[in-house]
Amino acid sequence: MKTFEGKVVVITGAGSGLGRAYAREFANRGAVLALNDYDSSSLRDTCALMPPRTKTFSSAFDVSDRDAMYRFADDVAAAVGPAHVVINNAGIAGVGAPAWALADKDFERLMAVDFFSVVHGTRAFLPHLRENADGAIVNISSLFGLTGAPNKSDYCAAKFAVRGFTEALMVEMTREPVSVHLVHPGGTATNISNNTGDTGFSDHFLRTDPADVAVGTAEAILKGRPRLVVAHAAFKTQVASSFLPRRLMNRILWHQLAPVIDTSQYPGTAARRAPRSTWPFH
């Protein structure tokens, strides 16, 4: 793909944060937008922020609803034409508690939104991308699709699943004219990230402007880069998780994160808590 001018770009979770930043970035590059969000009011706000010349189609629904996603793909094709780029961005952050304290329904809900919506979005739009013979699938993982973290077992599970699904898809699509991209944002300041019980974590780590991630993603598509690790702490974490012994990495993660998360449900936490390290996340 050489340009986004006139291309149909589908973005889920476009009502705020990174999804809204994607909408702005691709609108500024001349794309036709097909936007989704669960919150119809936020979705309307995003549409209103687009340049007047931008052709926009929008649909509010829950991305974990498989049938709704397939209807969306057909509705997009009917309204603005078959998709050229699909960005499976929608997600929720979870409740911010250790694995043993999570309710089954909360774990299942997060997996439905953060992982299975990516599967549904990819499979629903793939026939349309093939029809154009010039397309891109962009699946959003996370810093926590590179390493585990306390109070993030549900979120990490979903984002690692996105990573595995997308890496397999890259191999499967090798001989096709549709490129596949995996994005690992880290420390991105969005409403989704802020809506957890760990406000200290949000205040301390969520420093990156979503617009920077959106620019990096657009350039990755144009340059054919399959993986993008971008934003605060993501690259350092990728390197550390690849080369450090797991036990050392676990200690670093705990020392770094324990002071800024809710540790009230950890037995003996106060006695075990160590001074916070400033690496690899700074």
Identify the residue ranges that each predicted region occupies.
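Conserved glycine-rich cofactor-binding loop
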Residues: 8, 15-16
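Conserved glycine-rich Rossmann-like NAD(P)H-binding loop of the short-chain dehydrogenase/reductase
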Residues: 29-45
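The beta1-alpha1 cofactor-binding region of Rossmann-like NAD(H)/NADP(H)-dependent oxidoreductases
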Residues: 40-41, 60-71, 104
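Substrate-binding pocket helix/loop in short-chain dehydrogenase/reductase
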Residues: 97-99, 103-108
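Active-site helix of classical SDR
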Residues: 122, 158
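Residue(s) in the substrate-gating loop at a strand-loop-helix junction
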Residues: 142
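C-terminal helical subdomain
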Residues: 182, 202-237
